[in-house]
């Protein structure tokens, strides 16, 4: 007790000395706190993105569709549906005892379902960290369902909290991404019904978790296998629609959507589908869309090259070549990253290892007209 008393006395004396030093210090060197700094502190303490309010809410909502379309290529219809649903909620036209939005993203792999969720998190809440991704294939068995809300008292993991409820409790302003929802057990859907309908869920500790400030997005590949089997599926058969890289017309897109929607009604219960705000079908990507995505994928590479002290430029023919090599009608944009690695990054790596580049050099990438490859030239910046 005496030791603690002495420690307390010393701490109080130190605080008093620092206070006097601060009061008699140089006023010209005092730290000034403005509303932006206070907003950041409040945001860190509460998990609420207060700094987003610096921009007018109406202006941000009005420009959201335009911003997302610049980042997510060839999915304008899907973006419009998501943005309009969010705008209705934020303007107070929807039930307040309901999540901001509950969406189901449908479509084949590599068309931007998860990517749109990430960009939506950045635009809505200011950071990609606001996205919680849960792989629903881990909840295919019924006994795993309790992991979402936390184990009941007396069971292993009772003190850890649920993988869904605990994250939302700590960060209520977020996007919950339930990936491949069709693989989840039926008990998971029973849990989600309450969240989708009332915006709340009770965890294993008996606490009521508020989902009213979250966006819930479920992704599914339902119906894409049926598109392959029908032989007329968009880009799924060898000689089918879109397999030659030509733009896919609206009639074929509507046919693909109808096939997916028909299979969706067979796979999910009506009471589950009725609680969704929007069921959004993503269109298959064609070659012009992949060519546009090349520019987005190269931005991060350009930054890495500039961090090394060099500059980087690429001709349109070289971009078209990479797009054609990275275009697979069945897998969307995923093969594009491998094509950039194999044809662009490997060539840059060889050029860097030669040791002939000087600080400020410009690396020019073009298409070899005689061979099926790219050319890399070392140019000095003027």
List where the protein language model places each region:
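AAA+ P-loop NTPase nucleotide-binding core of proteostasis motors
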Residues: 2-382
């Amino acid at each position: 007790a005496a030791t603690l008393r002495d420690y307390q006395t010393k701490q109080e004396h130190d605080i008093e000395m620092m206070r006097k030093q601060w009061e008699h210090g140089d006023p010209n060197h005092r730290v000034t706190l403005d509303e932006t700094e206070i907003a950041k502190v409040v945001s860190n303490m509460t998990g609420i993105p207060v700094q987003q309010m610096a921009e007018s809410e109406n202006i941000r909502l009005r420009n959201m569709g335009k911003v997302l379309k610049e980042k997510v290529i060839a999915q304008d219809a899907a973006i419009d549906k998501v943005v309009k649903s969010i705008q209705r909620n934020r303007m107070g036209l929807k039930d307040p005892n309901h999540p901001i939005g509950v969406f189901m993203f449908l479509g084949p792999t590599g068309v931007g379902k998860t990517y749109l969720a990430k960009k939506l998190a950045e635009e809505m809440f200011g950071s990609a960290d606001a996205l919680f991704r849960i792989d629903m294939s881990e909840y295919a068995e019924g006994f795993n369902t309790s992991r979402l809300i936390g184990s009941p008292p007396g069971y292993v993991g009772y003190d850890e909290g649920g993988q869904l409820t605990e994250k939302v409790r700590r960060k209520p302003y977020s996007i919950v991404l339930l990936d491949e929802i069709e693989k989840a057990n039926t008990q998971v859907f029973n849990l989600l019904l309450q969240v989708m309908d009332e915006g709340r869920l009770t965890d294993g500790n008996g606490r009521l978790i508020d989902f009213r400030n979250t966006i819930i997005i479920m992704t599914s590949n339902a119906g894409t296998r049926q598109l392959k089997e029908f032989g007329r599926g968009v880009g799924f058969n060898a000689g089918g629609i879109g397999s030659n890289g030509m733009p896919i017309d609206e009639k074929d897109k509507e046919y693909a959507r109808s096939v997916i929607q028909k299979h969706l009604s067979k796979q999910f219960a009506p009471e589950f589908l009725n609680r969704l705000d929007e069921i959004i079908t993503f269109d298959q990507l064609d070659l012009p869309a992949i060519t546009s995505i090349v520019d987005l994928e190269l931005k991060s590479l350009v930054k890495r090259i500039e961090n090394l002290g060099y500059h980087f430029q690429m001709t349109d023919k070289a971009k078209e070549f990479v797009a054609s090599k990275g275009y697979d009608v069945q897998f969307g944009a995923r093969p594009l990253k491998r094509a950039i690695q194999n044809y662009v990054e490997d060539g840059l790596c060889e050029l860097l290892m030669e040791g002939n580049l000087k600080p400020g050099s410009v690396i020019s990438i073009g298409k070899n007209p005689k061979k099926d490859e790219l050319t890399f030239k070392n140019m000095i910046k003027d």
